[in-house]
Design a protein with these regions (language model features):
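C-terminal regulatory/interaction module of P-loop NTP-utilizing enzymes
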Residues: 1-197
Protein backbone atom coordinates (compact mmCIF):
# COMPACT_ATOMS: atom_id res chain seq x y z
CA UNK A 1 0.00 0.00 0.00
CA UNK A 2 1.26 3.43 -0.90
CA UNK A 3 -0.37 6.35 0.88
CA UNK A 4 0.49 9.94 0.18
CA UNK A 5 -1.11 13.32 -0.14
CA UNK A 6 -1.09 16.01 -2.77
CA UNK A 7 -2.51 19.47 -2.21
CA UNK A 8 -4.66 20.29 -5.24
CA UNK A 9 -6.30 23.61 -6.00
CA UNK A 10 -7.07 25.78 -9.01
CA UNK A 11 -3.40 26.84 -9.26
CA UNK A 12 -2.14 23.27 -9.58
CA UNK A 13 -2.11 21.28 -12.80
CA UNK A 14 -4.61 18.46 -12.44
CA UNK A 15 -3.59 14.84 -12.61
CA UNK A 16 -4.51 12.95 -15.76
CA UNK A 17 -7.62 10.76 -15.69
CA UNK A 18 -5.26 7.76 -15.86
CA UNK A 19 -3.67 8.79 -12.56
CA UNK A 20 -7.04 9.66 -11.00
CA UNK A 21 -8.32 6.19 -11.98
CA UNK A 22 -5.69 4.73 -9.68
CA UNK A 23 -6.14 7.16 -6.79
CA UNK A 24 -8.77 7.90 -4.18
CA UNK A 25 -9.54 11.62 -4.13
CA UNK A 26 -10.53 12.87 -0.69
CA UNK A 27 -11.54 16.51 -0.48
CA UNK A 28 -10.84 18.28 2.80
CA UNK A 29 -11.84 21.91 2.29
CA UNK A 30 -13.62 22.53 5.60
CA UNK A 31 -11.39 23.30 8.57
CA UNK A 32 -12.51 23.41 12.21
CA UNK A 33 -9.61 25.02 14.04
CA UNK A 34 -11.18 24.17 17.40
CA UNK A 35 -11.84 20.53 16.54
CA UNK A 36 -9.72 17.83 18.13
CA UNK A 37 -8.28 20.01 20.90
CA UNK A 38 -10.28 18.72 23.87
CA UNK A 39 -10.87 15.18 22.63
CA UNK A 40 -9.92 13.06 19.67
CA UNK A 41 -12.25 13.39 16.71
CA UNK A 42 -12.11 9.80 15.49
CA UNK A 43 -15.40 8.48 14.23
CA UNK A 44 -14.02 5.12 13.16
CA UNK A 45 -11.30 4.59 15.76
CA UNK A 46 -7.99 2.83 15.33
CA UNK A 47 -7.67 0.51 12.36
CA UNK A 48 -5.51 -2.58 12.34
CA UNK A 49 -3.51 -4.20 9.57
CA UNK A 50 -6.45 -6.35 8.45
CA UNK A 51 -8.69 -3.32 7.96
CA UNK A 52 -6.03 -1.37 6.09
CA UNK A 53 -4.85 -4.14 3.80
CA UNK A 54 -8.04 -6.17 3.51
CA UNK A 55 -8.50 -9.45 1.71
CA UNK A 56 -10.29 -8.28 -1.42
CA UNK A 57 -8.58 -6.81 -4.44
CA UNK A 58 -11.25 -6.98 -7.14
CA UNK A 59 -15.02 -6.96 -7.32
CA UNK A 60 -15.08 -10.73 -7.75
CA UNK A 61 -13.59 -11.07 -4.25
CA UNK A 62 -16.66 -9.49 -2.60
CA UNK A 63 -19.45 -10.17 -5.11
CA UNK A 64 -20.40 -13.71 -4.05
CA UNK A 65 -20.75 -12.96 -0.35
CA UNK A 66 -22.43 -9.57 -0.93
CA UNK A 67 -24.43 -10.11 -4.10
CA UNK A 68 -27.41 -7.91 -3.14
CA UNK A 69 -25.20 -4.97 -2.16
CA UNK A 70 -23.01 -5.39 -5.25
CA UNK A 71 -26.07 -5.51 -7.52
CA UNK A 72 -27.25 -2.26 -5.90
CA UNK A 73 -23.83 -0.77 -6.69
CA UNK A 74 -24.04 -1.99 -10.30
CA UNK A 75 -27.54 -0.58 -10.79
CA UNK A 76 -26.39 2.81 -9.47
CA UNK A 77 -23.18 2.78 -11.51
CA UNK A 78 -25.07 1.77 -14.69
CA UNK A 79 -27.34 4.82 -14.29
CA UNK A 80 -24.36 7.13 -13.75
CA UNK A 81 -22.47 5.57 -16.66
CA UNK A 82 -25.48 6.10 -18.94
CA UNK A 83 -25.02 9.85 -18.44
CA UNK A 84 -21.26 9.51 -18.97
CA UNK A 85 -21.73 7.60 -22.26
CA UNK A 86 -19.95 9.26 -25.15
CA UNK A 87 -17.69 11.32 -22.87
CA UNK A 88 -14.10 10.73 -21.78
CA UNK A 89 -15.44 10.42 -18.22
CA UNK A 90 -17.18 7.04 -18.62
CA UNK A 91 -16.00 4.52 -16.05
CA UNK A 92 -14.93 0.91 -16.62
CA UNK A 93 -13.86 -2.21 -14.73
CA UNK A 94 -11.30 -0.71 -12.35
CA UNK A 95 -13.82 1.86 -11.12
CA UNK A 96 -16.57 -0.77 -10.91
CA UNK A 97 -14.30 -2.91 -8.73
CA UNK A 98 -13.39 0.01 -6.50
CA UNK A 99 -17.06 0.97 -6.09
CA UNK A 100 -17.90 -2.57 -4.95
CA UNK A 101 -14.89 -2.83 -2.63
CA UNK A 102 -15.52 0.58 -1.09
CA UNK A 103 -19.22 0.00 -0.46
CA UNK A 104 -18.76 -3.52 0.95
CA UNK A 105 -15.91 -2.37 3.20
CA UNK A 106 -18.15 0.42 4.54
CA UNK A 107 -20.92 -1.95 5.65
CA UNK A 108 -19.49 -2.43 9.19
CA UNK A 109 -19.59 1.34 9.77
CA UNK A 110 -23.29 1.50 10.52
CA UNK A 111 -23.31 3.79 13.56
CA UNK A 112 -24.35 7.42 13.28
CA UNK A 113 -22.73 10.38 15.04
CA UNK A 114 -24.85 9.70 18.14
CA UNK A 115 -24.15 5.93 18.06
CA UNK A 116 -27.59 5.23 16.54
CA UNK A 117 -27.82 2.24 14.21
CA UNK A 118 -28.07 3.28 10.56
CA UNK A 119 -29.96 1.25 7.98
CA UNK A 120 -27.95 -0.72 5.46
CA UNK A 121 -29.53 1.36 2.71
CA UNK A 122 -28.25 4.54 4.32
CA UNK A 123 -24.74 3.10 4.77
CA UNK A 124 -24.65 1.92 1.14
CA UNK A 125 -25.93 5.29 -0.15
CA UNK A 126 -23.39 7.18 1.96
CA UNK A 127 -20.57 5.02 0.58
CA UNK A 128 -21.87 5.39 -3.00
CA UNK A 129 -22.00 9.15 -2.53
CA UNK A 130 -18.43 9.29 -1.21
CA UNK A 131 -16.93 7.08 -3.91
CA UNK A 132 -18.85 8.91 -6.63
CA UNK A 133 -17.10 12.08 -5.56
CA UNK A 134 -13.72 10.31 -5.29
CA UNK A 135 -13.79 8.29 -8.51
CA UNK A 136 -16.28 9.90 -10.92
CA UNK A 137 -16.53 13.62 -10.23
CA UNK A 138 -12.78 14.07 -9.72
CA UNK A 139 -12.26 13.08 -13.38
CA UNK A 140 -14.70 15.63 -14.82
CA UNK A 141 -13.18 18.83 -16.15
CA UNK A 142 -13.36 20.88 -19.29
CA UNK A 143 -14.82 23.85 -21.07
CA UNK A 144 -18.51 24.27 -21.80
CA UNK A 145 -18.20 22.26 -25.03
CA UNK A 146 -17.05 19.19 -23.08
CA UNK A 147 -18.95 19.77 -19.82
CA UNK A 148 -22.30 21.47 -20.36
CA UNK A 149 -25.01 22.58 -17.94
CA UNK A 150 -27.23 19.86 -19.38
CA UNK A 151 -24.56 17.21 -18.74
CA UNK A 152 -24.07 18.29 -15.11
CA UNK A 153 -27.86 18.45 -14.58
CA UNK A 154 -28.28 14.94 -16.02
CA UNK A 155 -25.49 13.62 -13.83
CA UNK A 156 -26.99 15.30 -10.74
CA UNK A 157 -30.36 13.74 -11.52
CA UNK A 158 -28.88 10.25 -11.97
CA UNK A 159 -26.93 10.50 -8.71
CA UNK A 160 -29.87 11.93 -6.74
CA UNK A 161 -32.30 9.30 -8.04
CA UNK A 162 -29.76 6.55 -7.42
CA UNK A 163 -29.14 7.59 -3.83
CA UNK A 164 -32.87 7.97 -3.16
CA UNK A 165 -33.52 4.50 -4.57
CA UNK A 166 -30.95 3.03 -2.19
CA UNK A 167 -31.72 4.85 1.07
CA UNK A 168 -34.66 7.18 0.71
CA UNK A 169 -34.92 10.96 0.44
CA UNK A 170 -32.98 11.84 3.58
CA UNK A 171 -29.48 11.02 2.28
CA UNK A 172 -29.50 13.41 -0.67
CA UNK A 173 -29.76 16.40 1.68
CA UNK A 174 -26.21 15.64 2.89
CA UNK A 175 -24.86 14.42 -0.45
CA UNK A 176 -21.29 15.54 -1.06
CA UNK A 177 -21.56 14.57 -4.73
CA UNK A 178 -24.61 16.72 -5.34
CA UNK A 179 -23.01 19.64 -3.49
CA UNK A 180 -19.84 19.26 -5.58
CA UNK A 181 -21.85 19.14 -8.83
CA UNK A 182 -23.65 22.33 -7.81
CA UNK A 183 -20.25 23.97 -7.20
CA UNK A 184 -18.94 22.70 -10.55
CA UNK A 185 -22.02 24.05 -12.33
CA UNK A 186 -21.45 27.45 -10.71
CA UNK A 187 -17.88 27.49 -12.02
CA UNK A 188 -19.09 26.67 -15.53
CA UNK A 189 -20.37 30.24 -15.99
CA UNK A 190 -16.72 31.19 -16.61
CA UNK A 191 -16.67 28.71 -19.51
CA UNK A 192 -14.64 26.03 -17.68
CA UNK A 193 -15.19 23.74 -14.72
CA UNK A 194 -13.38 21.08 -12.75
CA UNK A 195 -13.66 19.14 -9.51
CA UNK A 196 -10.81 21.02 -7.87
CA UNK A 197 -11.64 24.00 -5.65
Amino acid sequence: IVVGTVNMDETTFSFSRKVLDRAMTIEMNEVDLHGGLTERNEQIGKLGKAELIGYAVEGVDVYGANKDVCETVLTYLDAVNTVLEGTPFKVAYRTRNEFMLYVVNNLPYSKGENEEELSQGYVVARALDEITSMKVLSRIEGDDTKVSDKFLDSLSKAIEEGLKAVSGDDHTVKSISLAKLKEMKGKLVSGYTSFWS
